[in-house]
């Protein structure tokens, strides 16, 4: 009996050793990238190998197929390449006719869009170029936003944006780094609502890979009220049903009263909140991670800034302060602090200034917004996009 116990103990120890070896080997294989899907890329995991496949859609490869780029014999660069021929920048861009929709790219399979670059012409009509994204064959887009507002540059004029999620670079280069996973398909379109043709250079960089069930779908929605329908109150987002997380806000704000305009609080109504929200800010500039009116105490002017997570990237005109008619572009990305919800979400912001006697003033400003969030599908219906006249940016008129 003692010998049997001794042998059994040896077998048990041997089994544990083998099990540990198998575990360590599996862990090592995983560390080498065998279990990595190529998503969630950052500086720390760049050395990790994966089975993901990199693809790219552009006017030089409309399908993104392997080995099919740079083959065009017709395109916007044909005349410039007439002495060089195929392979020499024959199709670097597309012309999108007035009042038409162009499919920028269609992807089949599972994966994620990881970066988008585009540059339009003309720049001052970008509020009339509508971006739409569709996931997994849906007929109602998950993204429907004017191009300029999607890239946090909504006043039809160039503004440098130096953020993690969006970059706007010289001279009119719009870049997006929001991860956009899909499981069956993805489609990206551009509608030209202008009465003139537009030129678009673009590239959609994506990966084909497995997408875990824990990943939700990217959404973005545009709204505008001019003037505000409810004095002093603007709704950034409502009607969201499902589970997800709110990840960003862009506001294009035109002031219609003199003085400081940003005392209003942003409020997040989460999972059934009615009269009172779960999250309430302390002021507009506070939400955008500034303070005390964004004022530079030396110049006595608004101080623009653009950082990885937040910015006041546009002040028009830049050399005035507290004037009626001034315009502002502000962004706030919740990359490290997403606002999570399990059932529903509503987001509002107050338009609040000052009047005599140290009293708050409910403003009647012109506010346009883009809300960015991830959620499970299906998503709720979006509000109807404003008409062309409501999308246009009128001339800047500042009152002294």
Can you describe what each PLM-predicted range is?
Residues 1-2, 31-32:
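Initiator methionine at the very start of the polypeptide chain
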Residues 2-16:
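Bacterial N-terminal signal peptides that target proteins for export
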Residues 12-28:
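Bacterial N-terminal signal peptides
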Residues 32-400:
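Beta-strand-centric surfaces of beta-sandwich/beta-rich domains
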């Amino acid at each position: 009996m003692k010998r049997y116990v001794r042998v059994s103990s040896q077998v048990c120890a041997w089994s544990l050793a083998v099990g540990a070896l198998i575990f360590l080997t599996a862990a090592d294989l995983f560390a080498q990238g065998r279990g990595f899907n190529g998503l969630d890329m950052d500086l720390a995991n760049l050395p990790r190998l994966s089975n993901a496949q990199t693809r790219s859609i552009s006017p030089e490869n409309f399908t993104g197929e392997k080995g099919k780029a740079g083959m065009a014999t017709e395109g916007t660069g044909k005349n410039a390449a007439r002495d060089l021929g195929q392979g020499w920048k024959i199709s670097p861009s597309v012309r999108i006719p007035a009042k038409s929709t162009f499919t920028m790219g269609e992807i089949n399979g599972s994966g994620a869009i990881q970066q988008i670059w585009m540059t339009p012409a003309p720049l001052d009509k970008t509020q009339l170029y509508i971006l739409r994204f569709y996931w997994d064959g849906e007929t109602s887009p998950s993204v429907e936003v004017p191009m300029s507002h999607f890239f946090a540059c909504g006043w039809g004029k160039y503004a440098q944006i130096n953020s993690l999620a969006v970059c706007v670079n010289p001279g009119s280069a719009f870049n997006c780094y929001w991860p956009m996973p899909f499981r069956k398909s993805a489609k990206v379109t551009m509608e030209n609502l202008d009465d003139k043709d537009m030129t678009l250079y673009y590239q959609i960089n994506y990966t084909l890979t497995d997408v875990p069930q824990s990943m939700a779908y990217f959404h973005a929605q545009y709204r505008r009220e001019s003037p505000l329908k409810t004095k002093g109150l603007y709704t950034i987002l409502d009607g969201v049903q499902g589970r997800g997380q709110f990840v960003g806000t862009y506001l294009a704000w035109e002031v219609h009263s003199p003085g400081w305009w940003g005392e209003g609080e942003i409020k997040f109504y989460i999972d059934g909140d009615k009269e009172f929200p779960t999250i309430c800010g302390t002021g507009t500039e506070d939400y955008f991670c500034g303070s005390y009116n964004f004022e530079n105490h030396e110049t006595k002017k608004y101080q623009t800034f653009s950082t990885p997570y937040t910015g006041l990237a546009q002040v028009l005109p830049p050399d005035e302060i507290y004037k009626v008619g001034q315009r502002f572009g502000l962004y706030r990305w919740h990359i490290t602090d997403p606002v999570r919800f399990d059932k529903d979400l509503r987001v509002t912001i107050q338009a609040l200034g000052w009047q005599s006697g140290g009293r708050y003033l409910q403003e009647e400003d012109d506010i346009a917004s883009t809300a960015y969030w991830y959620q499970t599908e299906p998503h709720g219906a979006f509000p109807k996009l404003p008409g062309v006249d409501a999308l246009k940016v009128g001339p800047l008129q500042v009152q002294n």
